């Protein structure tokens, strides 16, 4: 290996190590009693059931989990009501939105930009954000197995935040866990909260 090639190799290797370190940043643990907001749509609100996942998550974590889910909300709606969420001064926001955008055929780039703008405003306030992927609701998916929309992975990577993937897709693909084609039942919301709690532990947030 020539001196120039060796130098190039060392520069590339060093850059790779630095990138890996920045991407594996340890999350700050949220203490019991701290305020956490669940921000989203009907899947957060608990439509179709007697319980919602934030209620179960509060039992599992000891956090004060505030449910800011509104049935029918799109990414634009959540962005518009974000000041109310920020006024609660949460340590962490569990953010899941997009399903209604898909159903209403909102342009993907518009949805993506709304989600990014919401995340950036929260981060600018020093709030930790965990993004929750939602299924890509299509006609074929409604009668088969759901899959996450790929944009969530892109957003999480771009904003360097953790992504809880496949949770809703798995639950809504199981008829025993849902109340209709796009909403969970009591068992489904409870299972979501339990799996989310496991993921939060893996991320060092719990």
Question: PLM features: residue spans?
Answer:
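N-terminal secretory signal peptides and thylakoid transit peptides that target proteins
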Residues: 1-23
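Serine-esterase "nucleophile elbow" of acetyl-processing enzymes
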Residues: 22-89
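Conserved Rossmann-like nucleotide-binding pocket used by diverse enzymes
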Residues: 17, 66, 130
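Alpha-helical cap/lid subdomain in secreted, periplasmic
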Residues: 55, 59-60, 79-206
């Amino acid at each position: 290996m020539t001196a120039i090639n060796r130098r190039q190799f060392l520069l590339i290797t060093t850059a790779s190590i630095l990138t890996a370190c920045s991407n594996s940043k340890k999350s700050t643990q949220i203490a019991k009693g701290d305020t956490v907001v669940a921000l989203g749509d009907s899947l957060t609100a608990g439509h179709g059931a007697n319980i919602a996942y934030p209620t179960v998550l509060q039992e599992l974590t000891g956090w004060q989990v505030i449910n800011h889910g509104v049935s029918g909300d799109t990414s634009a709606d959540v962005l518009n009501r974000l000041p109310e969420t920020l006024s609660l001064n949460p340590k962490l926001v569990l953010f899941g939105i997009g399903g209604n955008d898909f159903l209403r055929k909102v342009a993907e780039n518009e949805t993506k930009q709304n989600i990014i703008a919401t995340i950036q405003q929260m981060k600018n306030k020093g709030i930790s954000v965990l993004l929750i992927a939602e299924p890509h609701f299509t006609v074929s998916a409604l009668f088969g197995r759901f899959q996450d929309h790929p944009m969530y992975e892109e957003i999480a990577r771009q904003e360097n935040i953790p992504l809880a993937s496949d949770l809703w897709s798995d639950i809504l693909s199981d008829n025993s866990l849902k109340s209709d084609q796009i909403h969970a039942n009591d068992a489904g919301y409870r299972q979501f909260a339990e799996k989310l709690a496991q993921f939060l532990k893996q991320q060092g947030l719990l």
